[in-house]
């Protein structure tokens, strides 16, 4: 078992199903969580509210790690025309604003965009993708390029932007209702009251995940909360988990395939965009979300406000 796999599984256990010693550690770190929460709350005040003349929708979550924001953003883009995605571009090797995609043309490299932005760029229904640390500048650029709707990936905490906030509520909740580092929350849990819509799996959207069993495949992934792929672990000969946004090396993947006498990598699309030029045979784990009427109609109602 690799160090990366140990690290990811330890974090998953610590935040969601801690053992006795991990619970003790969480309480030892509680003073740090109080300081973290204080400064996180301060950061949400004292900024002038910015209002746009077109719809801005945010998809976010309170807890650390992935909850399905990317598939939900894609689902919104499939339902509505003219969607641009604006995101920070976490772990990219660039600074400032980059137009990753504009009207079906990819305009930058993976190192400039980051893996999540490039995953969005390959989605046909998404008309544009922009990465920017400054979300306001990213939104302005998107509308300048012709966006009808801007969807912000992971921007719930950007309370200075007037937007429709969709907060994803995971089926698997953190063990403690503490902020980091004692718990998995990035903002105190009471902040969920500031959401315009709390989206619950099963009630407001349905998640689909599919891949065929392949005994000649090694499942490799670098996503947050890899246990989300649990149902697929038995479909490959071996599984390896790396840190979220990990930059794969061709040689290490070759060694994993040789070690298990396999010829195929089983990956999510987010992982695939980082290895597509390596020349490996790949099998994609399909991760999709379908909106239910409760969420779809709320979004439609919000968008119609701008048509008046």
Swiss-Prot record:
The GO terms describing molecular function are:
ATP binding; tetraacyldisaccharide 4'-kinase activity
Catalyses which reaction(s): a lipid A disaccharide + ATP = a lipid IVA + ADP + H(+)
Q: Which domain of life is it from?
A: Bacteria
Q: Name one Pfam family in it.
A: LpxK
Name a single GO cellular component: plasma membrane
Which controlled-vocabulary keywords does the entry list?
Answer: ATP-binding, Kinase, Lipid A biosynthesis, Lipid biosynthesis, Lipid metabolism, Nucleotide-binding, Transferase
Look up the record and give one Gene Ontology term from the biological process aspect.
Answer: lipopolysaccharide core region biosynthetic process
Identify the InterPro entries for this entry.
Answer: LpxK
List its EC numbers: 2.7.1.130
Kindly list the positions annotated as binding ATP: 63-70
* Pathway stated in the Swiss-Prot or TrEMBL entry: Glycolipid biosynthesis; lipid IV(A) biosynthesis; lipid IV(A) from (3R)-3-hydroxytetradecanoyl-[acyl-carrier-protein] and UDP-N-acetyl-alpha-D-glucosamine: step 6/6
Q: Which residue spans adopt a coiled-coil conformation according to this UniProt entry?
A: none
Asked whether the UniProt record includes Lipid metabolism among its keywords, one would answer yes
Q: Which family does it belong to?
A: Belongs to the LpxK family.
Query: So what does this one do?
Result: Transfers the gamma-phosphate of ATP to the 4'-position of a tetraacyldisaccharide 1-phosphate intermediate (termed DS-1-P) to form tetraacyldisaccharide 1,4'-bis-phosphate (lipid IVA).
Protein name stated in the entry: Tetraacyldisaccharide 4'-kinase
**Recorded name of the encoding gene:** lpxK
């Amino acid at each position: 078992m690799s160090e990366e796999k140990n690290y990811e599984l330890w974090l998953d256990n610590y935040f969601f199903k801690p053992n006795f010693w991990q619970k003790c550690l969480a309480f030892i770190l509680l003073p740090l969580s109080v300081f973290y929460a204080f400064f996180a709350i301060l950061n949400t005040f004292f900024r002038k509210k910015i209002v746009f003349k077109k719809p801005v929708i945010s998809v976010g979550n309170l807890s650390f790690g992935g909850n399905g924001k990317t598939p939900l953003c894609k689902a919104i883009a499939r339902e509505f025309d003219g969607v641009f995605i604006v995101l920070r571009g976490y772990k990219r090797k660039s600074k400032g604003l980059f137009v990753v995609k504009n009207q079906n043309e990819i305009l930058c490299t993976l190192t400039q965009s980051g893996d999540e932005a490039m995953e969005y760029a390959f989605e046909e229904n998404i008309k544009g993708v922009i990465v920017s640390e400054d979300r306001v500048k990213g939104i302005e650029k998107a509308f300048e390029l012709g966006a009808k709707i801007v969807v912000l990936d992971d921007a719930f905490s950007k309370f200075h932007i007037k937007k429709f906030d969709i907060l994803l509520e995971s089926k698997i909740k953190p063990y403690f209702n503490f902020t980091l580092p004692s718990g998995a929350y990035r903002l105190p849990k009471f902040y969920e009251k500031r959401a315009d819509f709390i989206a619950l799996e099963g009630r407001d959207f349905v998640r689909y995940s599919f891949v065929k069993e392949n005994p000649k495949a090694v499942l490799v992934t670098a996503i947050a909360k890899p246990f989300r792929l649990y149902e697929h672990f038995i479909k490959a000969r071996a599984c390896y988990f790396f840190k979220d946004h990990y930059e794969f090396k061709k040689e290490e993947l070759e060694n994993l395939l040789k070690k298990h006498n396999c010829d195929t990598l089983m990956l999510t699309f987010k992982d695939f965009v980082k290895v597509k030029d390596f020349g490996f045979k790949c099998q994609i784990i399909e991760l999709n979300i379908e909106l239910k009427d409760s969420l779809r109609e709320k979004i439609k109602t919000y968008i119609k406000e701008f048509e008046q």
